[in-house]
Amino acid sequence: MTSLVVALCTTGASAQAAPQPLVADSGIAAAAVQLPPVPAVLDYQLGAAYTPPAGVTLVTRDSTATPAPGIYNICYVNGFQTQPEEHDLWLNQRKDLLVTGSNGKPIIDPEWPDEFILDTSTAAKRTRLAAIADEAITRCSQRGFKGLEIDNLDSYSRSKGKLTVDHNLAYAKLLQQRAHALGLAIGQKNSAEVSRRARNEVGFDFAFAEECFAYEECGDYSDVYGALVMDVEYTDNLPKGPFSTVCRSSDRPATTTLRDRQLVGPNNGAYRYDHC
């Protein structure tokens, strides 16, 4: 459970302190794109959609949900892997668009064993995949979301050599073009080490990270996107001490949030939420 034209200043946070409209540089006619607010108070609501806590100015929800009123909403799309509820659909109708191993069976994400890896290895397959992804991207736009979180850019690292970063960046460019045509900002998710290429070649507008502080990757994003980096840390993986330690660190993004791993709602006893 990993989704433009005027170039953003990537040398520091101050130049990106407020959202601004952009125009796309692709051949597709584009609507105005509004960037997420920075810094922001982020809530990450993929497991359940609920009224955001007081003070929240930015929320991410799944593409099947509706935006929270009155704040900036980012729409989650699993851009490079399949969703669990579509398991049979992909196996029965789209199997040729899945990466398969030497045994002919689709390769799965070992951490998310109900997700197949999409085959981005050829231009023809990327075009077909983008047409399928367009359903979710269009739904995000129609429901009023302002941004996209495209998950699993790093799927090539789980493809057993069948995919490369070049394949995924080329596919991401198709998603970026569609997002901007609909007026949606689009964020890089995963593959911190290729952030420079992702920004320059794809045209991602911001970065959405999970546990970049825990894995010491935040700088890879912020060096490219400045203040336009949002990070979610999790309660079960705080190797450097309590969340207050994260918040005191100059290495964290300005927009940093703590959540429980399953992202449950506040009516669940496992719910945890905090922010810097």
What are these regions (language model features)?
Residues 1-20:
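Secretory targeting and sorting signals
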